[in-house]
């Protein structure tokens, strides 16, 4: 989802 790159774990 756009803007959720910090949730890639």
UniProtKB/Swiss-Prot annotation:
Q: Any idea where this protein resides?
A: Secreted
Entry's Gene Ontology BP terms: neuropeptide signaling pathway
Task: Report whether RNA-binding shows up as a keyword of the record.
Answer: no
**Keyword Secreted recorded:** yes
Tissue-level expression reads: In larvae, expressed in the CNS and thoracic perisymapthetic organs (tPSO) but not in the ring gland or abdominal perisymapthetic organs (aPSO) (at protein level). In adults, expressed in brain and thoracic-abdominal ganglion but not in corpora cardiaca and corpora allata (at protein level).
Q: For this UniProt entry, what's an example GO CC term? A: extracellular region
Q: Where does the record place the modification Phenylalanine amide?
A: 9
Keywords on record: Amidation, Neuropeptide, Secreted
Question: What is the documented function of this protein?
Answer: FMRFamides and FMRFamide-like peptides are neuropeptides.
The family note in this entry says: Belongs to the FARP (FMRFamide related peptide) family.
Name of the protein described by the UniProt record: FMRFamide-like neuropeptide APGQDFMRF-amide
Organism listed in the record: Delia radicum
Name the lineage.
Answer: Eukaryota, Metazoa, Ecdysozoa, Arthropoda, Hexapoda
């Amino acid at each position: 989802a756009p803007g959720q790159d910090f949730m890639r774990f």
